[in-house]
Structures are given as C-alpha cells and as structure tokens.
Amino acid sequence: MSSSKTIGIIGGGQLGQMMAISAIYMGHKVIALDPAADCPASRVAEIIVAPYNDVDALRQLAERCDVLTYEFENVDADGLDAVIKEGQLPQGTDLLRISQNRIFEKDFLSNKAQVTVAPYKVVTSSQDLAEIDLSKNYVLKTATGGYDGHGQKVIHSEADLEEAYALADS
C-alpha cells in the first residue's frame, strides 16, 4: 500500500518507534516530536527536537502532518487544542485530559464507563496514610506526571510509609 500521508507522533520513545515502524511499513511518512534527538523513534523517523509542551514545536508538527497521535499521556492537551486542525487528532484531547490524572481516570472508568477497577483510595496528604494497615500491600501513586514507575511508592513497612509521606505531601 502506498500513501502520501504524514503521521505526526508526539513522543519518540519505544512505543513511538514501534508506531512509526508500523506506519512506515504501511507506506506513510512519520515525524515525531521528542525532547531527545537520539530517542528510539529517531532511528526510523524524522524528529523535531523540543519539549512536549512547546506550542511552537507542536504547531510545526501539526502544520507538517496530516494526522497526529501521541504515545503517552504526558502531552500538553491545551497546546494540542491550540494547534490542531479539525479532524487532525481523531482521538481528540478529552480522553487525554482524563488519562493525565489518575483520580479522574479511575472515576471515569468506574463511574462513567462502568469498568471494574481495583480498590483504591484518593490520598491528598500524608494524613490520609495515617491509619493504613501495614499487613496489606499498597502502591501510592501521584495523581499526575508519573510514568514507568516514577511517582510511585510500594508500601510494605513502616520505613516505606515514611517515604510515602513525602510523596503524599508533594
């Protein structure tokens, strides 16, 4: 199949690279936006080197591409809304905004989409951790910005709990 479409991928990590490989295999051209010039997608696609929240870089990507997508949720939704043309980001930014906050995401999945989710508790400060039962295991996660294990703390012991207090208050 041959295509003259250009796909823009925000994020040039391993997932972005795999998306690019698939798109190229189908005959598309790919341009990725990533802060690292040597990101994995750079091996197969043209790269615009800029932070994910750089509106000028997002605009440049949007102007050069027929369609846009993103490889992860830590993308500037407001910036995307400011630069995309109608239909250029088929998935839109509504679900992106929901996925950027774990509290919103859990609420959406359990209450709106009626998906069964694991039990959870919203923690807004270390005071919310004061009465947890250390005979059980917990994973404290930041509501925003976490990825690949960053912004998480597994709690098994009193020592873990002390570290979790700092994360909860951040």
Task: Explain the meaning of each model-derived region.
Residues 1-100, 104-107:
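ATP-binding N-terminal substructure of ATP-dependent carboxylate-amine bond-forming enzymes
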Residues 103-137:
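Anion-binding (especially nucleotide phosphate/pyrophosphate-binding) glycine-rich loop
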Residues 47-52, 121-125, 154-156:
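Short acidic-hydrophobic, aromatic-tinged amphipathic segments that line or gate anion-handling sites
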Residues 70, 89-91, 119-122, 140:
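General beta-strand structural signal in soluble alpha/beta enzymes
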Residues 55-59, 63, 81, 126-130, ...:
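Amphipathic, non-transmembrane alpha-helical secondary structure
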Residues 115-118, 138-140, 153-170:
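Conserved ATP-binding module of the ATP-grasp superfamily
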Residues 88, 109-115, 141-149:
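Acidic/polar active-site rim loop that often engages polyanionic ligands
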Residues 93-100, 121-128, 145:
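Short, glycine/charge-rich beta-strand/loop segments that flank catalytic centers
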